[in-house]
């Protein structure tokens, strides 16, 4: 089974309050694959870095970093806060599969399960421990950060093999 990969750089999800306090008038740059979500033209600054904003607003402010970005910001000796759901603060997102409940049932998957993806080619390899996230409206996509995508030379929108065991 093939699945499309989407590669994300550092970005943030803001609360309504933070969005208003920032003084930014967030305008849509483009829709993204998950229904109802979009990327803003504007960037939010935390005083150190600028983050692309993903909307709509959430209940907690969240700043998603690659492992490389985490190490640059906090150092190698600071254990990353691994994101599984919608934890607040600075997090390193776990690679994950978005899948609808109907598709998940067809594959025998439950929310929180893990699958793998495989990429062929000059940088062939496999990424295990891809967290399964299920919601009725999810589009079937794997989300990777730039570190993971670069390791296997996966381009945004490229298809890879999904391995369900």
Q: What does each model-identified segment do?
A:
Residues 5-118, 128-159:
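Short beta-strand-centered segments at strand-helix junctions
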Residues 120-124, 165:
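Short, charged beta-turn/beta-strand-edge "cap" motif at the junction between a beta-strand
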